[in-house]
A protein has these predicted regions:
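Substrate-engagement module of ASCE P-loop NTPases
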Residues: 147-170
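Conserved inter-motif catalytic segment of the P-loop NTP-binding fold
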Residues: 58-144, 148
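Residue-level signal for alpha-helix termini/capping positions
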Residues: 46, 119-120, 158
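Short, well-ordered alpha-helical scaffold segments within catalytic/effector domains
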Residues: 8, 34, 38, 112-116, ...
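Structural motif
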Residues: 24, 127-131, 165
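Active-site-proximal loop/turn and secondary-structure-junction residues that shape catalytic pockets
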Residues: 134, 170-171
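The Walker A/P-loop phosphate-binding site
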Residues: 1-83, 166
Length: 171
């Protein structure tokens, strides 16, 4: 019997995310990708609806890990505050269920190593956001490197039973 994976993310009532899988947002610069991701994460923090996005993370998968590979610490802090405001949560308190890391200064290999380490040590992560998936690669035009990265995302999503939502910025 095939077991249907738990649905955890919806937009306008249509499923966009399940545990054990991954998805992506793509678009050109300034096309509101990060704003939409902010609404998704805010919905996941509330386990409710924010704007047109809805989320339900099971009790044992309530933690959200947000990885940004491109922006400065200042801009990442602004994104984190926006997420908390959208969720109706205080912006001046640390949360156990929301971890935001900035990997701008790291190499692609080090970024993957850090994310893997965090997932290994945080079994309650239900949603991983990677804002800037391209920065986990050296050469975006390399078929073998692209395949390796997709395989890594598949291993992480199924192995840790979480949903990975990536952001790919188009030029």
């Amino acid at each position: 019997t095939y077991e249907v994976p738990p649905e955890i993310l919806w937009v306008n009532g249509s499923t966009i995310g399940t545990l054990g899988n991954f998805s992506a947002s793509t678009g050109k610069a300034k096309s509101k990708k990060t704003f939409n991701i902010s609404a998704i994460v805010a919905a996941a923090l509330k386990n409710d609806e924010v704007l047109k996005y809805s989320a339900y993370l099971p009790p044992n998968k309530r933690k959200i890990l947000y990885v940004d590979t491109e922006q400065s610490k200042y801009h990442c802090h602004k994104v984190m505050e926006r997420i908390l405001r959208l969720a109706g949560l205080p912006t001046d308190k640390d949360r156990d269920d929301f971890v935001f890391i900035v990997l701008r200064e790291q190499t692609p290999d080090k970024r993957k190593q850090i994310i893997g380490y965090m997932l290994e040590n945080m079994p309650d992560v239900g949603l991983l956001i990677i804002d800037g998936i391209r920065d986990l690669m050296y050469d975006i035009n390399s078929p073998s490197e692209s395949t390796d990265l997709i395989n890594l995302l598949m291993r992480w999503s199924s192995g840790y039973n979480l949903h990975i939502h990536t952001v790919l910025h188009l030029n």
